[in-house]
Every structure is written in C-alpha cells, then in structure tokens.
A protein has these predicted regions:
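Nucleic-acid substrate recognition interfaces
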Residues: 1-183
Length: 183
C-alpha cells in the first residue's frame, strides 16, 4: 500500500536563500516554456472563417512538448541566462536537473489541459505566466534524497537534499519502518 505524507520543512537561512534562487529559476523556466508554446500556438493556428483563399503560409514548426523542451536543459545549464526585462542573471546549474524536468512536466500538463480539456471535454482557461507570488513550490525528487532517521525527541527528521545538504523537517506523523522518499 502506498501512503503520501507531507511534512513542513524548516530550512536554515542559507538554505532558504538557495531555495529562493531555485524557485526563481524554476519560475523563469516555466514562463519561458509556456511562452514558447504560446508562440507556436499563435503562429500555427488559423481560424477557418477568417482565412483568405490565397495566403502565404509561415514556416510551420513542430509542436513543443515535454521531451522537446526537456532536451534543451543540458544546453541551458552550461551558461547563465539573463532575464531581458530585469537584467537578472539566473544560473541553471545551481538547480538539480530532475527539479527542472518536473517544471517541464508542469508546463506540459498546463498546456495540454488548455488544448485538449479534461475527460468530459471541457477546456480549462489559458495557462497563466507565473509571477514570483504565484510560483512558490517546486518538486525535489530523485536518488539524491536520503532520510536520516536521527530525530530529536521524535519531533524532527533530517532529509538530505542534493546541492543544499541536511534540511530539518518537522515530524508530526511517524514514518513507517523502511519508508522510501520519492519526492
């Protein structure tokens, strides 16, 4: 049987600063992917009732999807990206690759729901670009997560997060023996 537990992390000040950099980088990457998808959507769609009989066709390109956008991650991690409107420099190499891949999955899911709709066929609204106040979560998963079962009075656990170190986690519910961390 699979269980899902959520615990509150209590990072130190240095860890909070690093996690804020991660969230900002993931927010930029999400918005960039969404912008690429909207650009594709605007260039490749044509309303049937408004199209003239003779019109030049623009160069069509492949539809961006999870895999096509994920393959750009190694190139982006090589050099820092500069945000055009703020001049901010973001270093993608500071964020674990699997976290950025989860951002790709998040953007793909939002755009697919917009195009295809849910099981009843009703389409959701156009996905929004996320501001810093709207993008406040990220998923850290993979082989780098280790659970150190040293608890202080049964109240705290320590989770080893890649590129950050040990993060203190409040243990409000006991983990079963042999528990494996996935995310």
């Amino acid at each position: 049987m699979k269980y899902t537990y959520q615990y509150k992390a209590l990072p130190s000040t240095e860890q909070k600063l690093e996690l804020n950099v991660w969230v900002r980088t993931c927010q930029y990457w999400y918005n960039r992917q969404l912008g690429d998808r909207f650009d594709w959507w605007e260039r490749n769609r044509s309303p049937v009732n408004a199209c003239p009989l003779i019109t030049p066709l623009p160069d069509l390109r492949e539809r961006p999807n999870y895999y096509s956008q994920k393959k750009y991650l190694p190139e982006i991690k090589k050099q820092p990206a500069t945000v055009e409107w703020s001049g901010e420099t973001l270093d993608f190499s500071r964020v674990p690759a699997n976290t950025l891949q989860q951002v790709c999955k998040r953007a793909d899911l939002a755009f697919e729901r917009f195009l295809a709709g849910d099981s009843s066929g009703s389409r959701s609204g156009k996905p929004r670009f996320k501001s810093q106040s709207r993008y406040r979560s990220l998923i850290i998963e993979g082989a780098g997560l280790d659970l150190n079962s040293c608890s202080i009075g049964g109240r705290y656990l320590y989770v080893k997060v890649p590129k950050i170190g040990l993060v203190k986690v409040r243990s409000h519910r006991h983990l079963p023996d042999g528990a494996i961390l996935k995310q």
